[in-house]
């Protein structure tokens, strides 16, 4: 879904979002789209131009709003007509877990907000570092999407919810990308 340009500009002017796309002020943020809510939107998606997530009511029902509120700040989604969506909620992570990659991964620190800008490469070689995993059934990924345990994955598959991609991520004791120094300098959330 396409985020409204004036809304994105306002988020930047109010120092809620950095030019790099990082959310600086972690709080509930309402999403304003420049289009109507469509059936073609994925059940777990993002307002384009931001890292603000959107969850469809079917995912919300499956995960439970109280569980979602444990790991996300929850807001509303408005369409181009400024009508609140009954289909989607907005979500801003309270914390992030980085999916890691190999030595080809890119890592830098945003000069403006100090966030780690990391992209795991090569594709399809991703993993999670053991010590970064919280004791939760699901939690936000710093890349995109939601990391879930096996039990939640079974529920998602059984639910029949369409248009959800998933991949089993190995859990490694240590990162193999050579970027630990980048992650040692993480700013507080």
Predicted feature residues:
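Phosphate/anion-contacting hairpin/loop surfaces
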Residues: 1-189
């Amino acid at each position: 879904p396409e985020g409204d340009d004036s809304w994105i500009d306002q988020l930047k002017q109010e120092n809620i979002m950095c030019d790099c796309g990082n959310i600086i002020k972690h709080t509930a943020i309402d999403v304003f789209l420049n289009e109507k809510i469509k059936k073609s939107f994925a059940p777990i998606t993002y307002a384009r131009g931001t890292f603000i997530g959107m969850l469809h009511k079917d995912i919300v029902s499956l995960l439970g709003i109280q569980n979602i509120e444990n790991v996300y700040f929850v807001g509303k989604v408005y369409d181009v007509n400024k009508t609140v969506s009954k289909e989607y909620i907005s979500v801003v992570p309270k914390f992030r877990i980085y999916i890691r990659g190999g030595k080809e991964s890119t890592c830098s620190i945003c000069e403006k907000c100090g966030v780690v800008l990391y992209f795991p490469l090569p594709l399809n070689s991703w993993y999670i570092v053991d010590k970064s995993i919280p004791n939760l059934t699901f939690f936000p990924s710093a890349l995109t999407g939601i990391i879930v345990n096996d039990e939640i994955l079974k529920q998602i598959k059984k639910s029949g919810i369409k248009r959800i991609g998933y991949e089993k991520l190995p859990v490694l004791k240590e990162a193999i990308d050579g970027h630990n120094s980048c992650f040692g300098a993480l700013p507080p959330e």
